[in-house]
Amino acid sequence: MKKNNTILYYGCAAQARYASSNHGLLYSPSQAHLFNFSLARTYLNFSNGFRAFSTSLHLSYNQPLITYDLQDHTIDIEEMKKENLEKSFKSNTYIFKCLLNTINNKPINEKTQMEIEELLNKFTYASFSKKLEANQKNPEIIDYSLLNPKLAAILTDVRPTLISIINNLQKDYPDYFMAKLFKKSDKNEYYIGLVIKGLTPEEIINSIFFHVLKVLSFHTKKLDKSNSTSDIAFGMGKVLVENFYYNEFIKIKNKLSKEEQKCYYLSNWKKDNKDIVEKLEDNIFQFLLGQKISNLTKDTDLLDMETVTMAYREKSIVWKPTKKILKVLPEDGTLFVLPKKIPMIVKPKPYTTRVNGGYLSNDLYINENIVKEKWNLRDNTQILHFNQIFDLVNNLSSIGYKINTDVLDFIELYGSDYFKNELIDPRYSHPLLKKSKLTKKEKMELDSFLAKKELQENILGLAEIFRNIPEFFIPVNADFRGRVYCTPEYLNYQSTDLAKSLLLFSKPGRMYKKDYIALSYLKIYGGSSFGLDKLSANDRIKWVDKNLNNIKNYRNGKLIKEAKNKFLFLAFCIEYNRYLNCLDNHDVSWFDTYLPIQMDATCNGFQHLSLLSLDSNLSKELNLSESTWDDVPKDFYTFLVVCFIDYLKTELLENKNLTPKESESYNRLINMKIIREIIKKGIMTIPYNVSNFSLINYIREGFELEDNSLEWYIYKNEPSIRLKSLDFTVLGKGLRKVLHEKFHKLDLLLKYLDQVARVCTLLEIPIIWTLPTGLVVRQSYMIRDEVRIKPFNHSNKKFSMKVLNKTQFNNSKQITAFMPNLVHSLDAASLTLLLDFYFKESIDVKNIYTIHDCFAVPANKMECLISLLKLTYIKLYSDDKYLLKLDDDIRKNIRSTQNKGCFNEETLEITGDSFPDPIKFPDVQKVIGIVPSDFDFNVLKKSSYILN
């Protein structure tokens, strides 16, 4: 292409205008090689270079104007097209293309959504036939004979054998034999027969093939526990039971009148048949059922078993492809199955007290409650009549998203240039794949590589599927503490930075051009995603202004290559360019922004503990104190490092009992540059009651043994940092000691919570607390008994299984889990109250997503969100004084479970016949203080970094 002084401005409406060469080139990366200008009143001259004129410029989101500096770079359109095709990261996974076909060929409505859910959940999208013509007529079919003809032929050949085996299995359970089995004390075999007889051979084969193909996907993983025979058995058993439920439910539903059918759901059937359901939900039963069916994969020479050493003294039996299957598989791994749960193309069904929501098939052939219970808890979480949990889940699930196609296009075109450490080039084959025998370290390295590749393919593949969907939804549910989790796999806002960067809100936030605050938050986010979150807000704003040219010309890669969060920074650059281009459009006074900008709480677990205990000293280090945008945000980890070094120096001067090795370790740590990243993960876990052993291991995680050394460890991210084993112990124990000595009220709170858990454990009662959101958490961890079973027909190997003993508490778990569960529940309650404020705040578009202590909204809503978060903390900890309410909940539970008059409110002593000495209940006033605290909640309102 001939270069000249006239260059083109290329707009999203494919309109162009004249500009001189010092202005730069504007183009859409998604159409970088298409330059098709056949619009009226647009003139082009290609003989002497580009010349263009346009009457107007209209901006829509997914085709922004992007500046590119031609003084530094020249562009040859054909070369760029050729080069980018060679470096494409575009997902070429065949199974994703087939699902894309299904969505593209159908209207976006509830019927199509139901069809998608059925395809994914029942694995009805698979065909192994060689009759391509028939399959091509049905876009819902994934023809595995196209994906892998030899594998498809093997599965096609084995199908008649499987049908014959399954038919014989069903004949093995005649009615008289079932009656005989029912009379036995162990009814597992009876219920196995019940389920097998209640399914069609096709349903059983679909489950078998799904799990076989799951094992074959990236089969070269050496330490993949998801392919263990136990995990596959549980998974298969669960699927078969769900299919059985659906079949039985439909039988009953079809007998009802049309009016009755409208309000009859799977949950109704399960309540009516709770005795059967209780048995079929049993872990041992589902394992035995799944193992019986998965054994057929060995009988038909599809899979074989292998014993793998996972870790020291930890072995696992895993499913592996047989030699026959291995011959037809690619060595670098291929995805053979689609994720079962993906975003929805229509708004999720709302949860009510009567009907389960989320996916449209929920309460039809799947059954997922609004609160997902934990299997090792005896008692379920209770939702009170007046609650905010249903609104929380329904509101978050109703927020629409769309794919950031500009980010997706950029990644597909330039992934290998700018994201070498973040993405795996599709053409790259790991050298360890060709090595026959691997060391433990090499196995871990290869597994990590393949897991990353599988995650990347799923995220990019799903992004391609939803590329042209104008609005899709991400349903959520809650765990037993009220914490919100996304239901879809891979492509969701709680996934990786890659997934988050590909998500935009489907409806814009309106940001007025003169809204300095909103613009500032957008710039602050840009600086933070680049890696400058430790600078003051104003310094981040100045950095964006100073680097404006490279942000405009982000394709040159200068900033992207240096960015800490490259994908998020790329999304910011694209959005900021849209804003700059919008400034040129004088017909509108606002900018429609779709980008979620994220801000995090500072050490959120410690924030809740400081507010619970009203510890003003601790809160000052957690950005809960007065600050301005000129101030540098507090960094709790760096603060603790400084305190720790002071502690070591004091110990060296005053502690005469230090051993020579300890003194050597102290001096080494003092002279070494302890960076915050080394201690961050360990410190983060302290509010969650981590043991000293685990704390030390968290610190050690970032290190590895130096080559040819048995005593020196090097920090992986900075090999110049070298430590010995004793140094990790000194770090872990020293940091905890500093924390407790520096913050006395925190120490008192931790001791109080520990004592509460110990008292409840001694009394053998669950620990129950009520959250202001209407959720009642009932912590009741039970011990697990070991059961040995022999599930294989062809092997004498026995499995040791852990099953829940619902008669005996797990005392140690009850004690250690109380504080982390309480903190997580308070985190969840804060979010629930915040969203209640947020959705009632005004009638305009509500866009928000959350990752526990991270919040993302459009720039025009960030100021409002921060103000509401401050009000939430004040309501929860000042107005309602939650610690006193917690104390009252625990006492009420004790009084209700013990003999009348056993709890002396004055002495706080608990007496009873089952324990000889009185049990002392901790005094909450020692934490809060009889003298009013100097904690000033009004200071919260003046904090500029409560989110940063």
UniProtKB/Swiss-Prot annotation:
Q: List GO molecular-function terms, semicolon-separated.
A: DNA-directed RNA polymerase activity; mitochondrial promoter sequence-specific DNA binding
Extract the PROSITE patterns matched here.
RNA_POL_PHAGE_1, RNA_POL_PHAGE_2
Specify whether Lyase is a keyword of the entry.
Answer: no
Q: Which reaction does it catalyse?
A: RNA(n) + a ribonucleoside 5'-triphosphate = RNA(n+1) + diphosphate
- State where it is primarily located: mitochondrion
State the active site: D600, K680, D853
Q: Where in the cell is it found?
A: Mitochondrion
Q: Name one GO biological process term.
A: mitochondrial transcription
Write out the GO cellular component annotations: mitochondrial DNA-directed RNA polymerase complex
Q: Pfam families, alphabetically?
A: RNA_pol (PF00940)
Q: Which Gene3D superfamilies match?
A: 1.10.287.280, 5' to 3' exonuclease, C-terminal subdomain, DNA-directed RNA polymerase, N-terminal domain
Q: Which SUPFAM superfamilies match?
A: DNA/RNA polymerases (SSF56672)
Its EC number(s):
2.7.7.6
Keyword Mitochondrion among UniProt keywords: yes
Keyword terms, alphabetized:
DNA-directed RNA polymerase, Mitochondrion, Nucleotidyltransferase, Plasmid, Transcription, Transferase
Q: Which PANTHER family did the record assign? A: DNA-DIRECTED RNA POLYMERASE, MITOCHONDRIAL
Q: What does this protein do?
A: DNA-dependent RNA polymerase catalyzes the transcription of DNA into RNA using the four ribonucleoside triphosphates as substrates.
Q: Which family does it belong to?
A: Belongs to the phage and mitochondrial RNA polymerase family.
Descriptive protein name: Probable DNA-directed RNA polymerase
Q: Please report the organism this UniProt entry assigns to the protein.
A: Podospora anserina
